[in-house]
Swiss-Prot record:
This is Small ribosomal subunit protein bS18c. The lineage of its organism: Eukaryota, Viridiplantae, Streptophyta, Embryophyta, Tracheophyta. It comes from Cuscuta gronovii. Keywords: Plastid, Ribonucleoprotein, Ribosomal protein, RNA-binding, rRNA-binding. The keyword Disulfide bond does not apply. Its main location: plastid. PANTHER family: 30S RIBOSOMAL PROTEIN S18 (PTHR13479), SMALL RIBOSOMAL SUBUNIT PROTEIN BS18M (PTHR13479:SF40).
């Protein structure tokens, strides 16, 4: 008895079947660009039946209509607008990464220079002048 009411019991919730992507009034035609654009990916590829939830007959008609629209220049073969946007985003990201890399490099050099300046010590050169036989000293910094 416990197994029936356990966690593996199927729920009896009702669910609503989603509306079909193509209504009965929509006509699949190469001139209906608004309809065709809904079934093309951002890259310009034709979406599969599994994604679009179309029937086999609708998908065949849609493929033919999209191909005709491409040949007649109603639709682009590749969606260049989204490609250009994507390329621009990539370019901006690369520039930003390069700027960050250069800033980090400058910061490392600055830090190293400060460390070198702190490590500088003074030393004395001791030498004997043969003419004076006096002990001369000079202080230098490295």
């Amino acid at each position: 008895m416990d197994r029936i009411t356990g966690p593996f019991r199927k729920s009896k919730k009702s669910f609503r079947k989603p509306l079909p992507p193509i209504q009965s009034g929509d006509r699949i035609d190469y001139q209906n660009i608004d309809l065709l654009r809904r079934f093309i990916s951002q890259q310009g590829k034709i979406l599969s039946r599994r994604v679009t939830r179309l029937t086999l007959k609708q998908q065949r008609l849609l493929n033919l209509a999209i191909k005709q629209a491409r040949i007649l220049s109603f639709l682009p073969f590749t969606n260049t607008e989204s490609l250009e946007k994507m390329k621009a985003r990539i370019r901006e990201a690369r520039l930003k990464a390069e700027e960050v890399r250069l800033k980090n490099k400058e910061a490392r050099f600055k830090k190293a220079k400060e460390a070198r300046n702190q490590k500088k010590t003074t030393f004395r050169k001791i030498f004997i002048n043969p003419k004076n036989s006096k002990l001369n000293t000079e202080t230098n910094q490295i």
